[in-house]
Design a protein with these regions (language model features):
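Short beta-strand scaffold positions
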Residues: 11-12, 87, 110-111
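Glycine-rich phosphate-binding loop signature in dinucleotide/nucleotide-binding domains
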Residues: 2-5, 96-105
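Amphipathic, non-transmembrane alpha-helical scaffold segments
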Residues: 14, 82-90
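Acidic, low-complexity terminal tails and accessory targeting/binding regions
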Residues: 41-55, 102-105, 121-169
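Active-site catalytic microenvironments for nucleophilic, acid-base chemistry
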Residues: 23, 27, 95, 99, ...
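GST superfamily/GST-like fold recognition
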Residues: 113-117
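Phosphate-coordination/substrate-recognition cap region in phosphate-metabolizing enzymes
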Residues: 1-64
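Short glycine/proline- and acidic residue-enriched helix-loop micro-motifs
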Residues: 62-84
Length: 169
């Protein structure tokens, strides 16, 4: 991605996304802004548990709705629902589409799995019922959204620029 001329970068304030953006921008004089709306979906009292695969250790038997039926998923105490996540994504995208300062700019966004899915699904008009239908992208997968005349369109989704032997989360 070193051949892409970014005008600006916006990152989640969470460490993993911020460090990824800093690595991609290393040696470039590109502003890096933090935006809380790009943070990962909040899991409240379930933060820190593994939520997928053999390591899954979430004690709530209803958590399977998170992947199997997002419309029925109920956020844990202090957590965030899919509707809340999608609302955050929609607000962020509205700002990208409407702010003149972002017009005709190439902007790097560094975020997290569920938020990225929310951004892409919002652009494609997909609701909570089909939230995961396009799958979970691999870590550091690249998606491209183009905004023209205030309308967002997904151009590429889930492109990998590294050896694909990295373990899925």
């Amino acid at each position: 991605m070193s051949n892409i001329s970014f005008d600006l970068a916006i990152t989640s304030p969470l460490k993993r996304a911020k460090e990824t953006a800093e690595i991609l921008l290393e040696g470039r004089k590109i502003p890096l802004l933090e935006d809380e709306r790009l943070a990962e979906m909040g899991f409240g009292c379930l933060e820190g548990y593994y939520c997928k695969g053999e390591k899954m250790n979430i004690p709530d038997p209803k958590f399977h709705y998170f992947y199997d039926d997002p419309a029925c998923y109920q956020a844990p105490d202090g957590g965030e629902s899919f509707k809340e996540l999608l609302k955050r994504a929609k607000g962020f995208l509205a700002d990208l589409c409407e702010k003149k300062a972002y017009e005709n700019k190439t902007i790097l966004l560094s975020t997290h799995g569920a938020m990225l899915r929310a951004l892409l699904d919002t652009v494609k008009g997909i609701g909570v019922e089909q939230f995961w239908d396009s799958g979970v992208q691999k870590n550091c997968a690249v998606s491209v959204i183009e905004i023209k005349d205030g309308i967002a369109k997904v151009i590429e989704e889930g492109v990998i620029y590294y050896d694909d032997e990295v373990e899925d989360w």
